[in-house]
Amino acid sequence: MNYEAIVIGVSAGGINAMKTILPTLPTQFGIPIVIVQHIGARSDGEWFRILEKLCNIKIKEAEEKEEIKSGMVYVAPPNYHLLIEKDKTFSFSIGERVNFSRPSIDVLFETASEVYEDKLIGVILTGANSDGAQGLKKIKENGGLAVVQDPLTAEIALMPRSAIEATSVDYVLSLEKIAELFIRLDQNNLEQR
């Protein structure tokens, strides 16, 4: 399978989780990654700037109408839902909170699954609510790959547990093993080109 995007949902404990996964990805990592991290509406974005210093690949805040490109990590801006359009660009919404959250993981996952279908990898990491569980279910329904952090290794296990209860998942892994899986799937993409 040639995967075209990875979407990651993370909440409480997310900075530490991202510090474990993203810095291990090599410079030539090709699959674009889009992250919704539950953050406060007034966040200044420092959380991903910390990561940027540790990583080999470029991390940036997603922009309205921006085209999703390989080799990039995009993060949702505070206080906006991040959606993926059919032309593989971002759009923002200030619609109602979903699962008490804006940005919402479910909103990203559901729109991404409609665009990428079976070429999408959905990932749920540590967090303190059930956001992302229904979105991951939608990814599975559209033939995508579902990956969940092992709740036993999560800083807060509620979000991974909710995802596991909502749908059948392909992988339940530690953060280190998730990073290894990403690298392996990206290598498979290169070999299939």
UniProtKB/Swiss-Prot annotation:
List of catalytic residues: S11, H38, D131
EC number in record: 3.1.1.61, 3.5.1.44
A biological process from GO: chemotaxis
Catalytic activity reported: [protein]-L-glutamate 5-O-methyl ester + H2O = L-glutamyl-[protein] + methanol + H(+); L-glutaminyl-[protein] + H2O = L-glutamyl-[protein] + NH4(+)
Main location: cytoplasm
GO molecular function: phosphorelay response regulator activity; protein-glutamate methylesterase activity; protein-glutamine glutaminase activity
Assigned GO CC terms: cytoplasm
Pfam families: CheB_methylest
Enzyme superclass (EC): hydrolase
Keywords in alphabetical order: Chemotaxis, Cytoplasm, Hydrolase
Annotated family: Belongs to the CheB family.
Protein name per the record: Putative protein-glutamate methylesterase/protein-glutamine glutaminase
Organism the protein comes from: Leptospira interrogans serogroup Icterohaemorrhagiae serovar Lai (strain 56601)
